[in-house]
């Protein structure tokens, strides 16, 4: 409250103004309302320095007063025993549009007048009761509200606030579109607009399209979009709890079903339904089929577990819950003439073929041969699709009978496996597999065949020329040898004999693996170390020429030893070592080849043999070549090098002395020859000098007589040249005159030709002009005659002569002739004659 200020004792209070006056005697404050002139008493004090305006609330507005005064039922103020208005301290009062009113002492305006809130259509205010009160509605009905209650004030309308009610928030209606539903949840137990009792946490859908204003006990969960169903798409649903669906069918918790376009075009899942997945339609053509596992029983609507159903095209369907396709959609088995199907019975069933019936037991195998179409029934499993195998003469396959286990090979013609047969894969050792991929030749640069081998085909091997292959039959316990060139085909119980030969220099065991044994002739090289009688260690590099001697009665003898190269090198090496050990280094160094050949080949009757023959496998060594001999010991090698160097120096010095003597001898011979040549040259020089003197004398004589002859000859030649030049000049002048005359003639000819053509053109123009003039005159005359008419001409003819002349002159005729009709004139021929005469005269002028 403002501090009172003492002013004038007379205060003029205007209309709609007021002042607070304090009575100091009673300490009571009263209100004085204008218009009036207030005279303050001595015991009174005005609390306001100036009169205050009354509170004015415009229409459709309100304000809030704190600590309002108390009025009785008649609207009068209630005062206490001190004659002071009673206040509701701590309370508030909302006052609406009314006459201006003053504020009594203790009243406070919390909020200035504000407009009332207008609630639009599809809108509402969420209200909350702060304390208990009874609301009287417009229809005189009363509603009791308890503190904590919430309700909606729905539009359209104007909301008049109350101090007992709190506006929580504005609420707007939610628009539900077509093919859409609003999902709601109950915040507490209540009865909705459809008089349905809703429990706390219960959810439901509002499917009607349009505006929906959620209630105060309803919570919006979200929107549910409708599922669009087509002839190609369906949806699988799951019941989360037992309920009755929108089609009136009772669904139990956990039950699954599908909804298709036959049920409805669009479907909004209920709150008790869960969309598991969308299902696409399965379409079968007339060339397709499928097997459905656990099909739905149409009577009970449940899956027949463990059962299967065969479906064939043309048809379109959806898989029901619990159903599945075995191996998906399958095409009809179309068999050509060279194809067949191997079938197996999974259970016992009876197959009807025409009038006959065949009982198949579980595990039975049989085949269906083409050409035909075949759809296997449920009891039949297609084991494999077989095709007739084309085989050439040099091709084959291994076939095993699954009943007896016997394996055989089929060659030379196309073959279709029987129901109890299968292709057998022949196992081979890895080394044999690797050798089969390699070429049979010994060319190291030749490419290998890296493609994988079909182990069910008969194994073939091309034996190269001059080679042999041994094949062992384990069932018959015998071997056969094939000589090349030949193609080997292995039977099921046969295996190749793999040769493991020593290779490289020096020889290493098992370095060369091969299926074919080359018969030679060929050579091999080895490096061995020997020791002489005087303990000199030497390294020998030997080459052997060898070949096999084949015995036709016993060809397996060739493969008696698995490593003939190692055996050969060991045998010859031991012989060479023994022979070298009995010889000194100097002797062996001089006669190494003879010693080695004698040691290896031996001798008979005092003469050395020419070969070494191995009885075990028929190997023959025909020659030994010593390629190099090198000492192994460094000291021996150094002494050998020194001796060689000394021998080289001695030989070099002797050659130098011989060359020096020969050079001196040649030098002496060259000097003698040079002196002799000098003498001969001097004699020839004197002879040439005498000839020169004679020639000089002759030239002096000729010089004296030849000058006069030369001058006379020159003058004669000059005269001849001058005469010839004059003749040539005369000829050229004549030729020039002739050329000028010819050119002038040509110019005249060209000029005359041009003039003649010009005159002809003028004459032609004159002729054309004359012809056209004659034509014009003739036409003009005909037009005159036609214009005059026959009657007019007749009148002119009958007129006097003078009159005729005037009339004809008036027609523009310069000359005319009038005759009778009995003697006509041909004027056209006359004109032609005149024109012809003119043409003849022009030609004559030309």
UniProtKB/Swiss-Prot annotation:
One cellular component (GO) term of this entry: extracellular matrix
Where N-acetylalanine occurs, the residues are 2
Listed A to Z, the keywords are: Acetylation, Cytoplasm, Nucleus, Repeat, Ribonucleoprotein
Q: What is its main location?
A: cytoplasm
UniProt MVP repeat ranges = 2-60, 61-115, 116-172, 173-225, 226-280, 281-332, 333-388, 389-458, 459-521
Query: Where does the protein end up?
Result: Cytoplasm; Nucleus
| Disulfide-bond pairs as recorded | none
* InterPro entries in the record: Band_7/SPFH_dom_sf (IPR036013), MVP (IPR039059), MVP_rep_dom (IPR041139), MVP_rep_sf (IPR043023), MVP_shoulder (IPR021870), Vault_2 (IPR041134), Vault_2_sf (IPR043179), Vault_3 (IPR040989)
Under PROSITE patterns, the record lists: MVP
Q: Tell me the domain of life.
A: Eukaryota
Q: Which CDD domains match?
A: MVP_shoulder
- UniProt-listed PANTHER family: MAJOR VAULT PROTEIN (PTHR14165), MAJOR VAULT PROTEIN BETA (PTHR14165:SF11)
* Summary of the function given for this chain in its UniProt record: Unknown, though MVP-beta is required for normal vault structure.
Q: How does it assemble?
A: The vault ribonucleoprotein particle is a huge (400 A x 670 A) cage structure of 12.9 MDa. It consists of a dimer of half-vaults, with each half-vault comprising 39 identical major vault protein (MVP) chains. Dictyostelium is one of the few organisms in which the major component is actually two proteins (alpha and beta).
Return the protein name: Major vault protein beta
Source organism per UniProt: Dictyostelium discoideum (Social amoeba)
């Amino acid at each position: 409250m403002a501090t009172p200020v003492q002013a004038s004792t007379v205060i003029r209070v205007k209309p709609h103004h007021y002042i607070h006056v304090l009575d100091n005697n009673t300490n009571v404050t009263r209100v004085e309302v204008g218009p009036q002139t207030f005279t303050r008493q001595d015991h009174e004090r005005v609390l306001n320095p100036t009169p205050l305006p009354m509170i004015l609330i415009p229409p459709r507005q309100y304000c809030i007063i704190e600590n309002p005064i108390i009025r009785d039922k008649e609207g009068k103020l209630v005062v206490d025993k001190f004659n002071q208005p009673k206040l509701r301290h701590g309370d508030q009062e909302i006052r609406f549009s009314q006459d201006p009113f003053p504020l009594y002492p203790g009243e406070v305006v919390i909020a200035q007048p504000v407009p009332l809130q207008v609630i639009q259509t599809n809108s509402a205010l969420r209200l909350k009761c702060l304390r208990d009160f009874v609301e009287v509605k417009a229809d005189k009905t009363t509603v009791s509200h308890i503190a904590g209650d919430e309700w909606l004030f729905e539009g359209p309308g104007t909301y008049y606030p109350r101090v007992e009610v709190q506006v929580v928030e504005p609420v707007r209606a939610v628009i539900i579109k077509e093919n859409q539903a609003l999902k709601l949840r109950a915040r507490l137990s209540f009865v909705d607009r459809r008089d349905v009792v809703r429990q706390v946490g219960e959810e439901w859908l509002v499917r009607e399209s349009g505006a929906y204003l959620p209630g105060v006990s309803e919570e919006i969960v979200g929107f549910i979009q409708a599922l669009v169903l087509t002839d190609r798409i369906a949806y699988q649903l799951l019941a989360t709890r037992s309920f009755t669906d929108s089609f009136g069918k009772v669904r139990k918790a956990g039950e699954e079903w599908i909804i298709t376009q036959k049920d409805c075009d669009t479907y909004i899942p209920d709150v008790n339904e869960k969309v598991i997945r969308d299902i696409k339609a399965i379409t079968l053509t007339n060339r397709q089929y499928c097997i459905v596992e656990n099909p739905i029983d149409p009577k009970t609507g449940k899956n027949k577990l463990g059962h299967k159903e065969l479906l064939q095209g043309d048809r379109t369907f959806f898989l029901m819950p619990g159903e599945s396709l075995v191996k998906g959609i399958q095409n009809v088995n179309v068999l050509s003439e060279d194809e067949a199907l191997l079938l197996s019975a999974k259970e016992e069933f009876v197959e009807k073929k025409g009038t006959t019936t065949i009982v198949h037991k579980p595990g039975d195998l049989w085949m269906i041969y083409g050409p035909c179409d075949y759809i296997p029934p449920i009891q039949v499993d297609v084991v494999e699709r077989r095709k007739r195998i084309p085989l050439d003469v040099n091709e084959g396959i291994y076939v095993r009978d699954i009943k007896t286990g016997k394996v055989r090979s089929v060659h030379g013609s196309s073959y279709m496996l029987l129901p109890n047969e299968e292709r057998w894969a022949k196992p081979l050792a890895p080394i044999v597999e690797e050798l089969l991929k390699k070429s049979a030749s010994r060319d190291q640069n030749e490419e290998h065949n890296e493609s994988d081998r079909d182990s069910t085909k008969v194994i073939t091997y091309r034996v190269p020329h001059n080679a042999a292959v041994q094949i062992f039959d384990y069932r018959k316990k015998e071997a056969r040898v094939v000589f090349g060139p030949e193609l080997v085909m292995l039977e099921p119980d046969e295996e190749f004999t793999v040769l493991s030969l020593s290779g490289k220099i020096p020889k290493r065991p098992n370095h060369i693996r091969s299926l074919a044994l080359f018969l030679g002739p060929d050579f091999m090289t080895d490096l061995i170390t020997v020791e002489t009688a005087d303990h000199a260690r030497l390294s020998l590099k030997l080459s052997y020429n060898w070949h096999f001697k084949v015995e036709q009665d016993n060809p397996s003898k060739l493969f008696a030893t698995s490593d003939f190269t190692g055996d050969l090198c060991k045998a010859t090496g031991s012989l060479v070592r023994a022979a070298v050990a009995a010889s000194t280094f100097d002797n062996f160094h001089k006669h190494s080849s003879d010693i080695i050949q004698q040691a290896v080949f031996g001798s008979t009757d005092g003469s050395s043999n020419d070969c070494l023959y191995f009885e075990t496998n028929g190997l023959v060594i025909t020659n030994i070549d010593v390629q190099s001999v090198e000492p192994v010991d460094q000291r021996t090698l150094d002494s050998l090098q020194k001796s060689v160097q000394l021998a080289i120096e001695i030989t070099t010095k002797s050659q130098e002395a011989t060359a020096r003597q020969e050079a001196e001898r040649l030098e002496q011979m060259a000097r003698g020859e040079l002196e002799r040549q000098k003498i001969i040259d001097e004699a020839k020089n004197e002879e040439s000098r005498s000839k020169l003197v004679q020639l000089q004398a002759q030239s002096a004589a000729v010089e004296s007589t030849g000058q006069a002859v030369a001058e006379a000859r020159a003058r004669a030649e000059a005269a001849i040249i001058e005469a010839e030049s004059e003749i040539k000049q005369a000829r050229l002048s004549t030729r020039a005159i002739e050329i000028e005359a010819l050119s002038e003639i040509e110019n005249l000819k060209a000029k005359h030709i041009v003039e003649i053509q010009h005159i002809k053109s003028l004459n032609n123009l004159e002729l054309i002009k004359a012809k056209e003039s004659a034509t014009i005159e003739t036409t003009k005359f005909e037009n005159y005659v036609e214009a005059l008419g026959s009657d007019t001409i007749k009148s002119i003819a009958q007129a006097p002569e003078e009159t005729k002349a005037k009339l004809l002159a008036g027609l523009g005729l310069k000359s005319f002739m009038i005759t009778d009709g009995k003697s006509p004139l041909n004027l056209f021929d006359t004109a032609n004659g005149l024109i012809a005469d003119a043409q003849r005269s022009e030609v004559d002028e030309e």
